[in-house]
């Protein structure tokens, strides 16, 4: 089609129909549910060309996703079109950008924060573990529309807190919220900078500036309810493009009943062979939409089944089930003389995860309190290695890592891993499948743990894994390595019961 700016845009029939409907109804809200590879970013650029210059506010979750989006949509309203969620919140609050962690005074640490708030621990959790629990409470609160903290913001505990302990955690969390509000320089250190800024803007009653007529959000499955609350206060038309199957954990923020909806299932990136892998996942999920995924007939992604012991080729992106799985693959690849490197954003996080695991396994040699920035949030509910074992006893990658720790793997070994040193050459990248949404890579490998044959806890855990596998499969542009057929994997789990029943 030729856009109002006299530019030629090549569109699929489904995209063309949606754009024509949009142009005829510019004052109507719209939500597009589009599977991976349907060209959502390209479509978004076309929609923006139908609006007056400067009238569209484009939002994306992270700077990485915004940069990728800018490259895909082209020069629609300038090369710097759009804002990240945190940049938008800063604009509304008229706040300067919080200082990066490496620019903060050196005396700032989570230990110092715990002491400042006089957090002394809850139940058998030490000071730093209790602080991490409070941070999880604040994360849940910041994502919500709620105005006050309550027990519904508590994270899941394998052993539920007593009512007294729950009140103590909420009181600590309330104190932490008040302290962070007065000291925004801490935002980056506690790793909640974007959500804290958005929640502050929401609680302050902020609205989208009136100069914007439309708000467009890419990857809207990342949209927190608190940000939706801000947008809904204004009079702008809201256009969201997302994929519910790329929201593995947490709730997908739904739009109101009066919102025009459109589904696009035809993928311009993936072929029929990927279609045969993705549709069994869609059909098996217990609650999400069942519109079949349709691969392009003129596109072909090579799907390869790899044997046990296979090493991914140079430049491949390994998508793992968990941080335990990432740790396992990094150690295995290092033993083979290869570097498996976490993404830049994940490297510090994974190193902290590994250091915390080692410290809990060897408390006579290491202390979690000596870890810079404190123990990893994944361990906030554990005060001993036995508790870690109990929570992960069905995770094969965890059992493999535990065996390595029993053989003597320590912090010095961790620091010498090629993947943690950032060595390049014949290296590959590793990341968690759930965190790869919205990205695309030339060559992708799914780990065996991602397609585990062990029983899942319940239907909810299986649903979450189905979404993670969907994300992983749909990231590949040219070649995809899988350990076995996805339809057979689904059939295997259909033939066995879950470990537990969900619900009442």
Where is each model-derived feature located?
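The feature marks helicase ATPase cores and/or their adjacent C-terminal helical subdomains
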Residues: 1-504
């Amino acid at each position: 089609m030729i856009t109002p700016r006299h530019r030629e845009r090549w569109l699929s029939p489904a995209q063309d129909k949606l754009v024509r409907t949009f142009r005829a109804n510019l004052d109507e809200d719209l939500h597009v549910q589009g599977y991976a590879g349907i060209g959502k970013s390209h479509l978004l650029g076309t929609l923006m060309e139908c609006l007056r210059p400067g009238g569209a506010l484009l939002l994306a979750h992270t700077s990485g996703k915004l940069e990728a989006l800018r490259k895909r949509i082209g020069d629609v309203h300038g090369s710097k079109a759009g804002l990240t969620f945190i940049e938008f919140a800063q604009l509304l609050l008229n706040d300067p950008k919080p200082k990066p962690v490496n620019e903060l005074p050196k005396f700032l640490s989570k230990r110092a924060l715990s002491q400042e708030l006089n957090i002394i621990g809850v139940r058998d959790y030490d000071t730093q573990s209790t602080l991490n629990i409070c941070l999880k409470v604040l994360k849940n609160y910041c994502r919500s529309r709620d105005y006050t903290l309550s027990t519904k913001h508590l994270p899941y505990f394998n052993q539920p807190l007593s009512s007294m302990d729950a009140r103590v955690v909420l009181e600590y969390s309330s104190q932490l919220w008040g302290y962070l509000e007065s000291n925004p320089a801490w935002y980056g250190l506690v790793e909640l900078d974007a959500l804290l800024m958005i929640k502050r803007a929401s609680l302050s009653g902020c609205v989208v500036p009136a100069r914007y007529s439309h708000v467009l959000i890419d990857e809207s499955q990342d949209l927190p309810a608190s940000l939706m609350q801000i947008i809904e206060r204004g009079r702008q038309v809201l256009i969201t493009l997302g994929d519910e199957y790329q929201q593995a954990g947490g709730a997908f923020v739904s739009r109101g009943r009066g919102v025009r909806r459109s589904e696009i299932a035809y993928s311009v990136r993936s072929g029929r062979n990927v279609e045969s892998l993705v549709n069994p996942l869609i059909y098996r999920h217990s609650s999400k939409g069942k519109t079949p995924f349709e691969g392009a007939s003129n596109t072909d992604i090579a799907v390869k089944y790899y044997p046990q012991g296979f090493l991914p080729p140079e430049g491949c992106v390994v998508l793992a089930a968990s941080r335990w799985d990432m740790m396992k693959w990094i150690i295995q690849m290092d033993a083979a003389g290869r570097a498996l490197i976490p993404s830049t954003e994940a490297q510090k996080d994974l190193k902290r995860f590994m250091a915390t695991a080692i410290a809990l396994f060897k408390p006579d040699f290491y202390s979690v309190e000596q870890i810079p920035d404190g123990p990893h949030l994944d361990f906030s509910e554990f005060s001993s290695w036995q508790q870690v074992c109990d929570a992960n006893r069905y995770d094969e990658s965890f059992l493999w890592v535990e065996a390595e720790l029993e053989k003597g793997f320590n912090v010095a070994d961790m620091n010498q891993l090629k993947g943690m040193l950032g060595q390049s050459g014949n290296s590959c990248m590793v990341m968690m499948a759930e965190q790869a949404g919205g990205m695309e890579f030339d060559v992708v490998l799914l780990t065996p743990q991602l397609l585990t044959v062990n029983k899942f806890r319940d239907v909810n855990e299986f649903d979450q894994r189905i979404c993670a596998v969907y994300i992983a499969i749909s990231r590949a542009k040219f070649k995809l390595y899988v350990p076995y057929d996805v339809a057979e994997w689904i059939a295997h789990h259909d033939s066995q019961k879950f470990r537990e029943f969900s619900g009442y």
